[in-house]
Amino acid sequence: MLKSNLKIDNRFSVMGVVSQLPKRLKSPSGIEHCKFLLEHRSDQIESGFTRQAWLKMPVQISGNQLIEKTQSITVGSKILVVGFITSHKTQSGLCQLVLHAEQIEFID
C-alpha cells in the first residue's frame, strides 16, 4: 500500500482523437453506456531514443454522471480519458483491453 493511500493499482490515462462514432445504449438494468474508439499518436523517449507510440483503444463510459459529457463527443474530438483498463471478450472470442472512463476532458 502506498503511504498516500491513493488507489493507483489500475490507472490509465491517454490523450487522443475519437476515431469512431460513439455508440450509446442502455443496459437491461437501466444503466446508460457510451462506447467509441480513441486513437493516440505521440513520440516517446525510451533509452535515449525517440519511439513512435500509437494505439487505438476502445473506451467505455457508464453511468449518468459522465454520459452527459458524451453528448458532445464526435469523430475528431480531442480528449483526455482517465480510468481503468480491463479485458473484454469480443464476439470472435478474442480478449481486448478496454479503457473504462472515470474522467473525460476535452482538449482545445
From Swiss-Prot:
Disulfide bridge partners, by residue number: none
UniProt keyword DNA-binding present: yes
GO CC terms, sorted: primosome complex
Keyword list, A-Z: DNA replication, DNA-binding, Primosome
GO biological process: DNA replication, synthesis of primer
Recorded superkingdom: Bacteria
Stretches assigned to the SSB domain: 8-108
GO molecular function list: single-stranded DNA binding
Function according to Swiss-Prot or TrEMBL: Involved in the restart of stalled replication forks, which reloads the replicative helicase on sites other than the origin of replication; the PriA-PriB pathway is the major replication restart pathway. During primosome assembly it facilitates complex formation between PriA and DnaT on DNA; stabilizes PriA on DNA. Stimulates the DNA unwinding activity of PriA helicase.
The protein's name in its UniProt record: Replication restart protein PriB
Record organism: Haemophilus influenzae (strain PittEE)
